[in-house]
Amino acid sequence: MSIPRLKSYLSMFAAVLMLGQVLSAQAEEALPDFTTLVEQASPAVVNISTKQKLPDRRIAAGQMPDLEGLPPMFREFFERNMPQQPRSPRGDRQREAQSLGSGFIISSDGYVLTNNHVVADADEIIVRLSDRSELQAKLVGTDPRTDVALLKVDGKNLPTVKLGDSEKLKVGEWVLAIGSPFGFDHSVTKGIVSAKGRTLPNDTYVPFIQTDVAINPGNSGGPLFNMNGEVVGINSQIFTRSGGFMGLSFAIPIDVAIDVSNQLKKDGKVSRGWLGVVIQEVNKDLAESFGLDKPAGALVAQVLEDGPAAKSGLQVGDVILSMNGQPIVMSADLPHLVGTLKAGAKAKLEIIRNGKRQNLDVTIGAMPDDDADIGTGTGADGSAERSSNRLGVSVSDLTAEQKKSLELKGGVVIKEVQDGPAAMIGLRPGDVISHLNNQAIASAKQFTEIAKDLPKNRSVSMRVLRQGRASFITFKLAE
């Protein structure tokens, strides 16, 4: 090999080596450094332990099994977990249950945020600080609907977290959690924001932040930080089929939590807006049946009598597209928006009614302490009118008592389901039909007349009440 060619190869090798070093340095710079954030934020993160007295259901001394024949390892296990204790004269011994969670200090005088499920039904709450000192905590108040609890400990000049704005959080942004998974204090995990505005079952009023941050038992109630060291959420739940972390974690937005904590601090309870409707998601078939361009909005399946919606003129079958200018993309968006308003607030709804857009002004009510009782549907007495169409159902008029119980002006109850579309979509005897093809049903006779003229090969909606709960379903009639 000639000297010039060797020099050329050496120059190329050096260039490649330098390029690799540059790329490596850039990659290192691209990865976030959490050390400063953790050092500054950790002192305000606390471990929360609770104690609760429960009736003792352990096996009594006279009922203990014979452990002598067991191997030493198993014998020690049972002796440790099933200690022989004498019964009290009344036999009403108590045992103590303990739980573990996390929290964070939001004020230097000792207010602490955590999850409601961490401290629910606790007889004693202990907050352990980062210096391992322990303080008794007083429960200021809880809000089970958002799973937020506010505690108070006696203290001065306590370290506090910085509060951020969860509305400014972006999908793909780095986030970090500090907590006590399985009791390991101040464990740090990191990840990114996977989605915003998630709705989980039984958590209608929380637009959850979804992340892939590793969250495990004991992390509940701990803070979720952004890269500025600000708390943007409270780690609350995970989705799992194994009992452990599977990459899906959910945090309560700090904006929601602070609003709740302010109300708990001031009033000891939380009040939120209420519309008084039962809503459901608008899928592709429902969108077609209601004349919508695409699936969007919240379909009103039921309007509660004397509720704010009923007084404002909202009707069953209306599709709510926006509230105060904020679009309702999914039905779950509506409770989030309504819940942030106070009783007496005015709101403007954009709705679709009978295929036409219109605006409706409503006055928001106060959320009842308990869920409203909307009645329970029962079977009907009397003769059934045979449906002479391809739905395959026999129906009869509702009795006056049933109409009153279900708060309906009309409708029919299914007496029998034959082979056909009704059976295919899961209708059952006892189901109540109040609307068919966007028309209110007054009687069995009207139901039969409407059914005869149903369009073919097009989605048709039907409003059905089962055990008092209303929902719209769709079906298609073939040629």
Curated annotation (Swiss-Prot):
Belongs to the peptidase S1C family. Keywords: Hydrolase, Periplasm, Protease, Repeat, Serine protease, Signal, Stress response. Substrate binds at residues 218-220, 275-279. The active site is at residues 117, 147, 220. Its main location: periplasm. GO terms for molecular function: serine-type endopeptidase activity. The keyword Protein biosynthesis does not apply. Gene3D superfamilies: 2.30.42.10, 2.40.10.120. Its EC number is 3.4.21.107. GO terms for biological process: proteolysis. InterPro entries: PDZ (IPR001478), PDZ_sf (IPR036034), Pept_S1C_Do (IPR011782), Peptidase_S1_PA (IPR009003), Peptidase_S1C (IPR001940). It catalyses: Acts on substrates that are at least partially unfolded. The cleavage site P1 residue is normally between a pair of hydrophobic residues, such as Val-|-Val. PROSITE patterns: PDZ. This is Probable periplasmic serine endoprotease DegP-like. Residues 264-355, 361-468 form the PDZ domain. Residues 1-27 form the signal peptide. The keyword Hydrolase applies. Residues 368-395 are annotated as: Disordered. It is found in: Periplasm. Might be efficient in the degradation of transiently denatured and unfolded proteins which accumulate in the periplasm following stress conditions. GO terms for cellular component: periplasmic space.
